[in-house]
């Protein structure tokens, strides 16, 4: 676990962070440019010194200003992947990977190389690598130092779209197969949806929201950054069954089910789906005959008027589903908090 309780004045920005981050999975640090994202992880790794407070990683005190404790970066056991890979140009890939490698990681060298798909690059120099290949090597080098925590500062920011698409699957594999907590700085909501388990939203140096991705996404914290036509819900589901006759998979959403195109995952595998608010219509009674496969029981939590539309927050079991309808539809259905109804979902996408 990473415990943060510190403040730091950085020019006109006052960074004040109070948070406990989990000891597993990817925690995304999200915010616009200047929100304090990179400043936060620089304080964690020891590149800057907080003005006051404590930083504790797995019960090891890294910073305690009252006790005058400030552990230097090289003693914190933290890996750092920068926006630019920062490889040594005079070393081949193999040499870059072995630079700073912990003795106990020698036996895992081949596993990490295979995980990142860089076996064929070992004898090449950094100048001959693409941006995505350089970042994979940088990630491998960080992992081979045997870190207790891995920091990634917008690792896709300097890459063009094809290179981003090349690297994302490796990051997804990394999150699932390497048992090291990762702090992932990004201002891209798409990256967060694909990769993050937890999210911390920073705004002007302060924590605006934090928690599981599904919970933070369902709150109002991220909604200002989403274009009007991209307001959506993230739902946690698990594989229930495959359709006997059609290429469709049933996913369990609490005590209900959602049908999606065939998913090649084992039964009970957990994944996330994304549903755009504009693809959710509301009815008071379930339709008898309809082309829409997914009709879920839901209850109204609140209705919010936004730019001439109404965003309806629905409770589906323990999770939140958003619908966007017209004021006319809201009035016609006489929507009010606590009302039971049915949500018709026209389209579902798999995120992770």
From Swiss-Prot:
Belongs to the ABC transporter superfamily. Molybdate importer (TC 3.A.1.8) family. Pfam families: ABC_tran, TOBE. Keywords: ATP-binding, Cell inner membrane, Cell membrane, Membrane, Molybdenum, Nucleotide-binding, Translocase, Transport. It catalyses: molybdate(out) + ATP + H2O = molybdate(in) + ADP + phosphate + H(+). The gene is modC. Part of the ABC transporter complex ModABC involved in molybdenum import. Responsible for energy coupling to the transport system. It comes from Pectobacterium atrosepticum (strain SCRI 1043 / ATCC BAA-672). Its EC number is 7.3.2.5. ATP binds at residues 31-38. The complex is composed of two ATP-binding proteins (ModC), two transmembrane proteins (ModB) and a solute-binding protein (ModA). Residues 289-352 form the Mop domain. InterPro entries: AAA+_ATPase (IPR003593), ABC_transporter-like_ATP-bd (IPR003439), ABC_transporter-like_CS (IPR017871), Mo/tungstate-bd_C_term_dom (IPR008995), ModC_ABC_ATP-bd (IPR011868), Molybdenum_import_ModC (IPR050334), Mop_domain (IPR004606), P-loop_NTPase (IPR027417). It is found in: Cell inner membrane. It is an enzyme of class 7 (translocase). GO terms for cellular component: plasma membrane. Residues 1-229 form the ABC transporter domain. It is a peripheral membrane protein. This is Molybdenum import ATP-binding protein ModC. One of its GO terms (molecular function) is ABC-type molybdate transporter activity.
């Amino acid at each position: 676990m990473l415990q943060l309780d510190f403040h730091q004045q950085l020019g006109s920005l006052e960074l004040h962070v109070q948070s406990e981050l989990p000891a597993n999975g990817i925690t995304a640090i999200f915010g616009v440019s200047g929100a304090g994202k990179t400043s936060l992880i620089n304080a964690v790794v020891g590149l800057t010194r907080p003005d006051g407070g404590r930083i504790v990683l797995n019960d090891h005190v890294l910073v305690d200003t009252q006790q005058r404790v400030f552990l230097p970066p090289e003693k914190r056991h933290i890996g750092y992947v920068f926006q630019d890979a920062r490889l040594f140009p005079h070393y081949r890939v193999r040499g870059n990977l072995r630079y700073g490698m912990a003795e106990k990681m020698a036996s895992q060298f081949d596993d990490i190389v295979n995980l990142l798909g860089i076996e064929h690059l070992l004898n090449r120099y950094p100048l001959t690598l693409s941006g995505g290949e350089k970042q994979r090597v940088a990630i491998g080098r960080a992992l081979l130092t045997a870190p207790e925590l891995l920091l990634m500062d917008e690792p896709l920011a300097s890459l063009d779209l094809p290179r981003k698409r090349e690297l994302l699957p490796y990051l997804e594999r990394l999150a699932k197969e390497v048992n090291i907590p990762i702090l992932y700085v990004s201002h891209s909501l798409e990256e967060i949806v694909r990769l993050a388990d937890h999210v911390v939203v920073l705004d002007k140096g302060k924590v605006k929201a934090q928690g599981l991705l599904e919970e933070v996404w369902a709150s109002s914290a991220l909604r200002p950054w989403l274009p009007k036509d991209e307001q959506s819900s993230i739902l946690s589901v698990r594989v229930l069954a495959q359709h006997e006759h059609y290429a469709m998979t049933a996913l369990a959403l609490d005590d209900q089910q959602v049908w999606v195109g065939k998913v090649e995952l084992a039964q009970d595998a957990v994944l996330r789906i994304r549903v755009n608010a504009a693809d959710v219509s509301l009815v008071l009674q379930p339709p008898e005959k309809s082309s829409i496969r997914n009709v879920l029981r839901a209850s109204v939590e609140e209705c919010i008027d936004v730019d001439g539309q109404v965003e309806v927050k629905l409770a589906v079991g323990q999770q939140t589903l958003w619908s966007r309808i017209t004021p006319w539809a809201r009035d016609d259905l006489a929507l009010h908090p606590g009302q039971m109804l049915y949500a018709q979902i026209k389209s579902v996408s798999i995120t992770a």
